[in-house]
């Protein structure tokens, strides 16, 4: 029986606060995978996970910032 793969959390994962609201940006991958996943979680625990995979954790973080800048933080609060 094989062990489940370890989840690798990027050191770039962070909390972003704007307009009095905080979003947790989680960037992670499975240890045997190359590409990174992006998830943004609001204060209520609701999350948005990107369908796209990212070649680097920096690319994932850039995508999170871009989405927040373009859509506004309110788009993540629902």
Where are these regions (language model features)?
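Intrinsically disordered, low-complexity regions of eukaryotic proteins
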Residues: 6, 28, 41, 53-54
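Solvent-exposed, flexible loop/coil residues
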Residues: 16, 20, 54, 58, ...
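A short, exposed loop/beta-hairpin motif centered on an aromatic-Gly-Thr core
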Residues: 45-59
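Short, surface-exposed linear segments at secondary-structure transitions and domain or protein termini
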Residues: 34-36, 56-67
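Short N-terminal "domain-start" leader segments
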Residues: 1-34
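Short arginine-rich
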Residues: 66-78
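Short aromatic-glycine-(Arg/Gly/Cys) micro-motifs in beta-strand/loop hairpins
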Residues: 28-48
């Amino acid at each position: 029986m094989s062990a489940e793969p370890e989840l690798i959390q990027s050191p770039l994962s962070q909390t972003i606060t704007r307009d009095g609201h905080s979003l947790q940006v989680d960037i992670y991958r499975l240890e045997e995978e190359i590409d990174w996943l992006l998830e943004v979680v609001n204060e209520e625990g609701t999350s948005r996970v990107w369908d796209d995979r990212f070649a680097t954790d920096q690319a994932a973080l850039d995508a999170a910032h871009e989405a927040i800048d373009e859509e506004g933080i309110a788009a993540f609060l629902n």
